[in-house]
A protein has these predicted regions:
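Multi-pass membrane proteins that catalyze or facilitate reactions on polyprenyl-/lipid-phosphate substrates
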Residues: 2-37, 45-186, 190-328
Length: 328
């Protein structure tokens, strides 16, 4: 087995059978949903970290002409197997559960200065570790290194775009759903932040919290169309240009670190549609030595070690844990 195939090995959960496999997929979906709520953090990063990224992309890609033909002929059993139905349902239920349960809590946490620092510190540790663990699976060369740099620059530019306040027409909501879901399945580029840039984040989060169905359904339809279209492109790239594609995705994650750096200072603000202040421009600053700083660093370290621990459970070749813990 060559290095590339060894690096790409992962536990196949496309057809879960045991309760533990279903639970793992549900919790993976929950982690993805929780991540996607936070502007600057990507659910795609969580999928990468937890080893289901390629399986997810291929499962979404399976909604094709063959799936339509099976549906028309009422071959339900074959259809459900073809589209990895059990995998998608378990993952999707976890994701939706996180969105419904955590939308209000994470929204409140993001509005609290201390809570935002702690939340971003934890996710900073997660993303930093994922750069190391996923990057270790790439066969590095001049081409892949250049791909990494391009990905990092693109992500850095995107996360530094100043958010706007947009209209909320059905067409705009539909397109926003398409763009956001595309970002969500790209590690490092946050779907929530794309909604923030387009001026839709507060509106959609409020709609979810208040169970306002029309805008939720419109955004959801856009997301379905967007993810079906983009998954085909990404699946092709992973199959044909695996190392280059993963290097770009790792670059996306690296470029996003600027956005989720925990300690920031607001340079310019404005009132949102609720009359609350919203920061339009900010800069990263050095933290003050305090109890909050110590707790934030602790959460950062926990996030960092958690990702490396989960990666080692899957591959036994984690660059951090493999020297201190060799599993049988």
């Amino acid at each position: 087995m060559d290095k590339k195939e060894k690096n790409r090995q992962h536990i196949d959960l496309s057809d879960p059978k045991t309760p533990m496999e279903y639970l793992r997929l549900f919790l993976t979906g929950f982690a993805m949903g929780a991540s996607d709520i936070v502007p600057g953090v990507s659910g795609g990063t969580m999928a990468f970290i937890l080893g289901v990224y390629e399986t997810l992309i291929n499962a979404i890609k399976s909604f094709n002409v063959d799936a339509i033909r099976l549906a028309i002929n009422f071959k339900i059993k074959e259809l459900l197997e073809h589209v990895s139905f059990k995998f998608l349902v378990a993952l999707g239920l976890g994701l939706l559960t996180a969105v419904v349960l955590l939308a209000g809590f994470l929204s409140d946490t993001m509005e609290d200065p201390h809570g935002k620092i702690f939340l971003f510190a934890f996710f900073f540790g997660l993303v930093l570790a994922s750069i190391i663990t996923v990057g270790a699976k790439v066969k590095w060369s001049i081409i892949t290194a250049l791909s990494f740099v391009i990905g990092a620059v693109v992500a850095f530019v995107i996360v530094n775009v100043v958010p706007t306040e947009g209209e909320h027409t059905p067409l705009i909501l539909f397109v926003s759903g398409m763009i956001a879901i595309t970002a969500m399945i790209l590690p490092g580029i946050s779907g929530s932040f794309m909604l923030l840039i387009m001026g839709q984040y507060d509106y959609i989060l409020t709609s979810v919290s208040e169970r306002d169905l029309p805008p939720i359904i419109t955004v959801g339809l856009g997301a379905v169309v967007g993810i079906i279209l983009f998954s085909r492109v990404l699946s092709y790239l992973l199959a044909r240009f695996y190392d280059i594609t993963v290097a770009v995705l790792v670059g996306f994650m690296a470029g996003s670190l600027w956005k989720i750096y925990p300690w920031k200072e607001c340079l310019a603000d404005d009132l949102d549609r609720h009359g609350d202040f919203r920061c339009l421009a900010e800069q990263n600053i050095l933290p003050d030595a305090s109890t909050d700083f110590a707790l934030a660093i602790g959460l950062l370290i926990i996030g960092f070690l958690l990702v490396n621990f989960l990666d080692h459970l899957q591959s036994n070749e984690n660059p951090v844990f493999r020297h201190i813990w060799k599993r049988n």
